[in-house]
């Protein structure tokens, strides 16, 4: 997994961040994407969030809902590895001690650890023509007394074209630009 230097990370505006094309090995990303399509055939082109297939996807979506107990939630995260081994490999790689050490070196933040609950994390998808509003993710964990220090977004869109839109944008604090 590619990283940038600490100097480059902290020189980004309006907030320290990194954007790395081909961050992960492309063959791993392609295999993960293909697994998601095999498990959820309408992954690439679905338009109806209420379809039966779409509802079934929630079975593997590792986001803790308020009506789910911890065992079900953790089981679902673990199920991802058995159903989609390459996706599971990415999850494992990005939560590994080695990766956390690299993030720590790049950011200068010591004692990083991952959220074993994946609260607010996991696999997210925007439908064709969909939109995700500009927002700020929570800072305080919804269950534990932890502060979020780093977000990581990994896009799995092979052959993505800039004219499609959907670019990652960093806005200023008052969301005016």
Task: Name what the model sees in each region.
Residues 1-6:
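N- or domain-start disorder-to-order transition segments that initiate the globular core
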Residues 7-106:
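Non-heme Fe(II)/2-oxoglutarate
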Residues 80-177:
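Catalytic core of non-heme Fe(II) oxygenases with the double-stranded beta-helix
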